[in-house]
């Protein structure tokens, strides 16, 4: 495997794997920034809002159509804590150019979509679309309430979050 990783800005990396044995390719852009309690809600909402669209493709319907035209490419925006940092990953997966029926340059379109999502989000004025943020906030709140109500899942997640006071993880 030939995984290549390029820093395209401080704390921002582009990863590229030129493996020939697969018929699909993936482009990922990773952002790393300090994890802070006071920004936890914003960090949880950010990928949900970013996945809805970007400046050149501002809504979910347009985004879905664009991905369908790219032979069902898949765009994901994911965020997760990694030690003392928070990692945001914008990733797109789709078929390689050589499998395009009409010779389309799909990889260029994948890169444009990933870069647009990462660096040119859809703003209303100078902020994310308040309607999209409100919808995603409600959906996230419901998901968290559902998790708390699912006692078994809630206990599992709490057990995996922090070690007991003795410093040893329960088994």
How should these model regions be labeled?
Residues 11, 72-74, 130:
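Generic secondary-structure boundary/loop-capping signal
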Residues 44-51:
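Active-site SXXK
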Residues 15-17, 23-38, 43, 60-120, ...:
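M16 family metallopeptidases and their MPP-like homologs
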Residues 1-11:
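Short, Gly/Pro- and small/polar-rich lid/capping loops
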Residues 53-56, 98-101, 120-129:
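Short, polar/flexible loop-turn hinges at active-site or ligand-entry regions and domain interfaces
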Residues 130-133, 149:
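Conserved phosphate/pyrophosphate-binding and hydrolysis machinery centered on Walker-type P-loop NTPases
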């Amino acid at each position: 495997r030939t995984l290549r990783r390029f820093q395209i800005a401080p704390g921002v990396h582009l990863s590229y794997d030129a493996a020939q044995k697969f018929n699909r390719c993936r482009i990922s852009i990773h952002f790393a920034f300090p994890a802070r309690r006071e920004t936890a809600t914003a960090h949880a909402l950010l990928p949900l809002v970013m996945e809805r669209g970007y400046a050149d493709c501002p809504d979910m319907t347009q985004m879905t159509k664009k991905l369908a035209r790219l032979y069902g490419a898949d765009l994901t925006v994911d965020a997760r804590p990694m030690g003392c940092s928070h990692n945001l990953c914008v990733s797109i997966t789709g078929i390689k150019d050589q499998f395009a029926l009409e010779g389309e340059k799909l990889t260029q379109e994948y890169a444009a979509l990933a870069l647009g999502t990462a660096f040119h989000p859809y703003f209303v004025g100078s902020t994310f679309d308040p309607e999209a943020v409100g919808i995603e906030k409600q959906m996230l709140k419901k998901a968290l309430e559902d998790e708390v109500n699912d006692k078994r899942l809630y206990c599992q997640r709490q057990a995996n979050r922090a070690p007991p006071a003795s410093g040893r993880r329960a088994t």
